[in-house]
């Protein structure tokens, strides 16, 4: 079941077509790690996360951020089945990685901020509302294994 209107879907897919996954992904994950430093504990293998500049310049942060946004691209193709789309990732993050599901919500909010910064006037209140709905849906789907 989807709670996305045709307008939501159009706003999400239209903006997504303009997103540079590598750049936006690295920036989003980097900002999450800077603003919410406790999230760094999940990335011990990434090397130096000792300062904002170390985090933002870390190639492993950039690569994983791109991977996260690539996964988000799959969600955008499957807005009507976010829970199904993220079933395996929810299981991995819950059972194996023990990630607090609140972190998914935080990451989504950071992504919305990054999109707003990079897309200026195109990032209207309506587009923001649609993206906020989508990242909330993704966070819920990723957290579904926890419930």
UniProtKB/Swiss-Prot annotation:
Q: Which domain of life is it from?
A: Eukaryota
In its keyword annotation, does this UniProt entry include Repeat? no
Keyword annotations: Acetylation, Heme, Iron, Metal-binding, Oxygen transport, Phosphoprotein, S-nitrosylation, Transport
Q: Which residues carry this modification: Phosphothreonine?
A: 13
**GO terms for MF:** haptoglobin binding; heme binding; hemoglobin alpha binding; metal ion binding; organic acid binding; oxygen binding; oxygen carrier activity; peroxidase activity
The residues that hold heme b are 64, 93
Any GO BP annotation: hydrogen peroxide catabolic process
Annotated InterPro entries: Globin (IPR000971), Globin-like_sf (IPR009050), Globin/Proto (IPR012292), Hemoglobin_b (IPR002337), Hemoglobin_oxygen_transport (IPR050056)
- Record PTM Phosphoserine, positions in chain: 45, 51, 53, 140, 144
Q: Which GO terms describe its cellular component?
A: blood microparticle; haptoglobin-hemoglobin complex; hemoglobin complex
Q: In which tissues is it expressed?
A: Red blood cells.
Quaternary structure (record)? Heterotetramer of two alpha chains and two gamma chains in fetal hemoglobin (Hb F).
Task: Report the protein name in the record.
Answer: Hemoglobin subunit gamma-2
| Naturally occurring in which organism (per UniProt) | Sapajus apella (Brown-capped capuchin)
Gene behind the chain? HBG2
